[in-house]
Amino acid sequence: MDPISQGDALQEMPLREGEHARLFTAARFSGLECLSARFSTHTYSPHAHDTYAVGTILSGCELWHARGRTLFARTGDLVFNHPLDVHDGAPSEGGYRYRMTYPTIELMREVAISLTGDETIGTPFFPEPTVQDPEGSALFSEAHRVLEEGGDGLAGEEGLLRAYAWCLSRHADLSVRDIGRERGPIAQARELLEQRYDEDLSLADLTRRSGLPRHHLIRAFRRETGLTPHAYLVDVRVRRARERLRRGESPGAVAAATGFCDQAHLTRAFKARLGVTPGRSEERRVGKECRSRW
């Protein structure tokens, strides 16, 4: 996911007793966003990220939907979502604790190239969204914990790269090229929503771009992406809002610039998709770069 900003960081959302969600960034990975959370009731609305989502379940079970499948992620599982994979999430069997990171395509390709020596390698693809791998889970969890605590930047940096290499070497197909770059009618509609997310687009705009009738467009769009055109537009707006928050813009200004009616609308959409709200809080960045500021 796109990271948070100093002065306009993403603060913890109001959760039920015993729940928490903490979003932080790893400075040594150019602001790589990380999440540590425990949920017993909170559910995520369907959403997508510009980045991968790679993480592990520490305890409990998460029920989620992705790639047209109903999935269960349990203790010791590794979880993989590709960029723009639409997914949701809900507690199952009493709730769950998990750690998650949101690496860019460039970072995952960098690790894949170091494993294979092939600089022409495509976008790493994980055939299974969830795999049982206690050893890989422990490796990832320890690196994530070190990054969160911020005590030893080099250890966290090395550990996370080792964890990503483990995931790629054991669970990824490195021969797949250009995930999500199809050029069909739905791709054309998605491109318009990505480009003009701050406008009040109509179905007529999307039909002109895609060449599909309105009723066909809605059904086909949902079948291919998992979201209706409107839900996809809101998701794009949230992703672009996070980019602006990272640059230090205020939530009110960000809401106006990204097509939301007001800050309250932004907050509701943000919370539903990401588990945290945009708010004024002191950002904690992990790594030597930011520790030197204190």
Give the label of every model feature segment.
Residues M1-H20, R285:
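Short, low-complexity, intrinsically disordered N-terminal peptides in bacterial proteins
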Residues Q11-E12, E19-I121:
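N-terminal regulatory/effector-sensing and dimerization cores
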Residues L115-D178, E191:
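Amphipathic alpha-helical segments enriched in hydrophobic/aromatic residues interleaved with Lys/Arg
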Residues E142-D152, A163-L174, A189-S202, F221, ...:
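Basic, amphipathic alpha-helical hairpins
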Residues E194, E199-V236, E243-R246, A255-R280:
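Basic/polar phosphate-binding segments, predominantly the helix-turn-helix DNA-binding elements
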